[in-house]
């Protein structure tokens, strides 16, 4: 689950980290009022969406009057912001963050993730702030500094000082950076985060450090023990199909292809997507119905896949272990009848009751293409999607 920038900065402030004075507003009038509350003669207004690249898309602007702040809010509230990280429809803007203006001398990067290989929280810092950190990691990996946090003792001040020295900070900046580093590490652990970024972490003209941005992603598996963060969830930023899938305990991720995929098991689902790509197709989704799939969940999975107008064909790839193939077959038949499927459906069944499942499908009288292997299934569904 992601948080908006203004929500992330609220958490930063609770941990004593330096952030800009600002207000998240819902109306153009509130945007103008926020300028009065903040004071000064210049403000930064930011559209709040769960996506990067807002600045290049016109979603971040420096304004020099209350009227301009109000006009910006009128321009974006209720509209969708399209960035390089969104799909063609963009993300809806329901809040605008109005902040005081910051005089920047230098931009740094500071972030943290859970490193699966070491099973530790790893902090990353770089002098290349304000840019895409993935690009820095690819082009100049030597510019990214890393520190691993011991889960037994947590982040230590000496680790913060070491990073500060390597970033070229001096004097009070070292103390400030260490304070920010330790605070972010505590926040990361307290709230079960999966990712945290301050990009950029800036050195102001007066030499002080300042958190100019906040990106926070929470481990969804830990939300049951984070009621405060659950309350911060903005459902408007979720893909409607993904939200519906979550209610049925289905793992669904929307993609941009035209071949719908329904598979049991995350590994098999990824393998299925790979082989579809290998044969020239483009998956429209990742969908794992799980090991404990029921007929009802399979029916809902089918509905979710077919709710995507881009889907030209559907591939169902089931390996029956815990899940019986005949039950999956009944779910497919039920969904096809209920939804009124108008696209080709290719089914590959293997394992528990696979022969019975194939028989159920064959006797259904529906136009379902049976595949003999995974390769055959991929080839057939790619042809079907192309109308061949």
UniProtKB/Swiss-Prot annotation:
Q: What catalytic reaction does the record list?
A: succinate + ATP + CoA = succinyl-CoA + ADP + phosphate; GTP + succinate + CoA = succinyl-CoA + GDP + phosphate
| NCBIfam families, sorted | PRK00696.1 (NF001913), sucCoAbeta (TIGR01016)
Q: Where, by residue number, does substrate bind? A: 264, 321-323
Protein name as it appears in the record = Succinate--CoA ligase [ADP-forming] subunit beta
Q: HAMAP family per the record?
A: Succ_CoA_beta
EC assignment: the record states: 6.2.1.5
What does the entry list under GO cellular component? cytosol; succinate-CoA ligase complex
Please provide the Gene Ontology terms (biological process) for this protein: succinyl-CoA metabolic process; tricarboxylic acid cycle
Role this protein plays: Succinyl-CoA synthetase functions in the citric acid cycle (TCA), coupling the hydrolysis of succinyl-CoA to the synthesis of either ATP or GTP and thus represents the only step of substrate-level phosphorylation in the TCA. The beta subunit provides nucleotide specificity of the enzyme and binds the substrate succinate, while the binding sites for coenzyme A and phosphate are found in the alpha subunit.
Which residues of this UniProt protein bind ATP?
Answer: 46, 53-55, 99, 102, 107
The GO molecular function terms of this record are: ATP binding; magnesium ion binding; succinate-CoA ligase (ADP-forming) activity; succinate-CoA ligase (GDP-forming) activity
| Residues binding Mg(2+), per UniProt | 199, 213
Question: Pathway of this protein?
Answer: Carbohydrate metabolism; tricarboxylic acid cycle; succinate from succinyl-CoA (ligase route): step 1/1
Q: Which cysteines are joined by disulfide bonds?
A: none
């Amino acid at each position: 689950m992601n948080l908006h920038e203004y929500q992330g900065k609220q958490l930063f402030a609770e941990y004593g980290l330096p952030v800009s004075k600002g207000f998240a507003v819902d109306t153009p009038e509130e945007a103008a009022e926020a300028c009065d509350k903040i004071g000064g003669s210049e403000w930064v207004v930011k559209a709040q969406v769960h996506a990067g690249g807002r600045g290049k898309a016109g979603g971040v602007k420096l304004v020099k009057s209350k009227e301009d702040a109000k006009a910006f809010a009128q321009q974006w509230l209720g509209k969708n912001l399209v960035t390089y990280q969104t799909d063609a429809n963009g993300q809806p803007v329901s809040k605008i963050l109005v902040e005081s203006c910051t005089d920047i001398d230098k931009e740094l990067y500071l972030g943290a993730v859970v490193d699966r290989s070491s099973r530790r929280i790893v902090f990353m810092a770089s002098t290349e702030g304000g840019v895409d950190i993935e690009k820095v990691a690819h082009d100049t990996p030597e510019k990214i500094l890393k520190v691993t946090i011991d889960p037994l003792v947590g982040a230590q001040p000496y680790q913060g000082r070491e990073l500060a020295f390597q970033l070229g900070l001096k004097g009070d900046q070292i103390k400030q950076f260490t304070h920010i580093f330790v605070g972010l590490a505590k926040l990361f652990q307290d709230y079960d985060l999966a990712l945290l970024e301050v990009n950029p972490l800036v050195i102001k003209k007066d030499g002080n450090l300042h958190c100019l941005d906040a990106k926070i992603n929470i481990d969804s598996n830990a939300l049951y023990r984070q009621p405060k963060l659950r309350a911060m969830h903005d459902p408007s930023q979720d893909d409607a199909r993904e939200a519906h899938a979550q209610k049925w305990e289905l793992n669904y991720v929307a993609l941009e292809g035209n071949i719908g995929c329904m598979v049991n098991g995350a590994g098999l689902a990824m393998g299925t997507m790979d082989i579809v790509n290998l044969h020239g197709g483009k998956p429209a989704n990742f969908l794992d119905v799980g090991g404990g799939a029921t007929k009802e969940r399979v029916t809902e999975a089918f509905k979710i896949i077919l709710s995507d107008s881009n889907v030209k064909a559907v591939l169902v790839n089931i390996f029956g272990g815990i899940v019986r193939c005949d039950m999956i077959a009944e779910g497919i038949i039920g969904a096809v009848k209920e939804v009124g499927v108008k696209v080709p459906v290719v089914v590959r069944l293997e394992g528990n009751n696979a022969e019975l499942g194939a028989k159920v499908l064959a006797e259904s009288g529906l136009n379902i293409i049976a595949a003999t292997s995974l390769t055959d299934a991929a080839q057939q569904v790619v042809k079907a999607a192309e109308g061949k």
